[in-house]
């Protein structure tokens, strides 16, 4: 996965522990948002790039997405730092740095799908899914929802609430064609299996032609 562009938004309060919120767009058209570049805590060296965290009802904490390797995390961190440096130099609060120009996004390759299926009852959420993209980015908290009107199965990406109080925004976003590939992968897995042991692939998606 190559980083195509990075956007940073600096807080007006320069004393904040948050240096910037950040989002990254990759060459497969996937955009991850709601990351925070934090000032180092006491005893730490260097700024910290934090991916969003979800607190579940059971008391556990989960990341809607996270890099699959220290190397990819470092690449993400470096891109955010470079973009912030240019924003500071330009004296602007909202800044986007373009790393590569992409005429057409390529299709991502999905692998290591993990699906947990819930009992078939009145609750609309029927399963939760995690999947790895291009071997470098793990996407979590993807829900399979059974809609009633009209009757359909929906593959819903995780959301967070904006501070402005507007409708929830997605933690990561897809282009239309890759989302269709993800939808097919997830729904095929949902109807094939009841539950999959941790870290066991259900299906490796081939790159669509």
Whereabouts are the PLM-identified features?
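Single-stranded nucleic acid-binding surfaces, predominantly the OB-fold ssDNA-binding core
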Residues: 1-209
